């Protein structure tokens, strides 16, 4: 599910898909055929999951699933009008187009999986990222505390060497306070 998918593979997949499935909106077939007619456009086509998170996305469904027939996302704008999507693609051929197809068995279909790419706009695993962030924060907190403790111990040693009882007592209290609040 990553790497660059050759245009030939994308076109072969779309030919197979259009032969095997009927899209809920016939304009979607026209749109996919239009994309296949231009290799430069196909270079910018990426099949992904969670396409709605992408800056420019086409989401299409076949008759055998219970999802929205067609949706075009462009930044925060959403439309169900395939003609608007066609016009946008024609006017902005250099922009990446992320396509998500809803059809029966999509998640296990080897033809679809072969052209499916990682969605760069979706964190790999949001839960994992949150856990890693917490671990990093805890590590940073322990590191700062360890540094502060070592610095206090160094300054306590200096106070002892200088026979500075007042500074020694103040720093000892700070060290004790730091250790109590670290548990």
Swiss-Prot record:
Pfam families to which the protein is assigned, alphabetical: IDEAL (PF08858), UPF0302 (PF08864)
Highest taxon listed in the record's lineage: Bacteria
Listed InterPro entries: IDEAL_dom, UPF0302, UPF0302_N, UPF0302_N_sf, Virus_scaffolding_prot_C
HAMAP family, per the entry: UPF0302 (MF_00760)
Family: Belongs to the UPF0302 family.
This protein's name: UPF0302 protein BH1670
Organism: Halalkalibacterium halodurans (strain ATCC BAA-125 / DSM 18197 / FERM 7344 / JCM 9153 / C-125) (Bacillus halodurans)
Upper lineage: Bacteria, Bacillati, Bacillota, Bacilli, Bacillales
